[in-house]
Structure formats: C-alpha cells, structure tokens
Amino acid sequence: LMMICQLAGFLGAGKTTLMVRLGKELSKAGKRVAIIVNEVGEVGVDGAVIEAYGLRSVELTEGCICCTLSGSLQNTLRIIAKEFKPDIILIEPTGLALPSKINTIIRTSMVEVDRNVSVALVDAYRAERLFKETKAFFSRQIAGVDVIAINKVDLVPEEKIKEIEDLIRELNPGSRIAHISAKEGEGVRELIEALGVL
C-alpha cells in the first residue's frame, strides 16, 4: 500500500529543496517516489520532462518522478497511484494550504492510502517573525501535523533553535521534531526515520 507525506510551510522555508532531497534519499533506499508540486519549474531540476496522462513530470532519479499538479489534487493523486504505483507520494501544497484541508482532499480522493503523514517545515531563521506576524495561521499549521522539521539549523545559534522548539511544543505537544538543513542534507535521514517511512 501507498503512503502519502505532505509538507507544509511558508514560502521560502525550503520545502522544494527538502522534497527533492527526500525523493532522492527514499528512491536510493529502493522506494518508488512521486512528488507533487504546484509547478515543476520551481524545483529547478534537470531531467527528461515526461508528458504522460496529462501530467507534466520530471524524472529526478531512478524511481522518483516530480509531477505538476494537474487540475485537482484528487485527480492528480488518482493518476499517479494508477500509472506510477509509488510507495510514497510527497505533496508540496502552496504555502497557504493547511494540512487539515489537504487531509480532507486525500480522504475523498478514492486512492487507497496506508498512511498519511504531515510535516510542517519551520524556517529557523524567520520563525519568530512569522509567528508574530501570522500567529493564528502559523499556529494552525503547526498544530495539525505529525512531524515538525526545523530547517536552516546551520544558520542560527543553538539557543534560538531551543526557543523555537519550546514554541512548537506549546502549539503541538505530541509532535516529533527533527532538526535539519535541507540545503546541506543535514538531518534528512533522521527526518525520514521520524516519518516512519523506512
């Protein structure tokens, strides 16, 4: 059966970089991976563009494709599940999509899913400012997820990361937290373990 992992986070948090890194790591581990993004061009990857079944996709590595959202997310999920038969689908919704809304779409998509895991990517560099400026939305995005990945940990001091972690614990006490640098690849393996994918 198939697993779905959606990645929430504000614009600039590093979602696309992390998606590509996760896709490559998981396919190296023998998993068939499909990534759904709003626009393949944003991924900035080289690769043969595959125009199949109305989906514009790019092959990232052996066993890992990246597809542009085609019409509705439900439709895209159905096409990918039927034609590509992935072990894992990684979804990068827009920065303004709440995980709870995406969960509803997944539930009503008529695709058989073994597990649906949601991750919020928090930009360590901008977390405090984003929390102050968009408190209600930031809180809802954090509260509704299974795993929180604090990204860009290589750019901020340890005590700052601790403060962000305390804030996250207040908003979502039951979540697992991973410290990563998507750009450097640091902590990505630990994040995969926290997701329970491998």
Placement of each model-derived feature along the sequence:
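A general structural signal for short secondary-structure boundary/capping elements
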Residues: 4, 81-85, 135-138, 162-168, ...
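Canonical P-loop GTPase G-domain recognition
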Residues: 147, 154-198
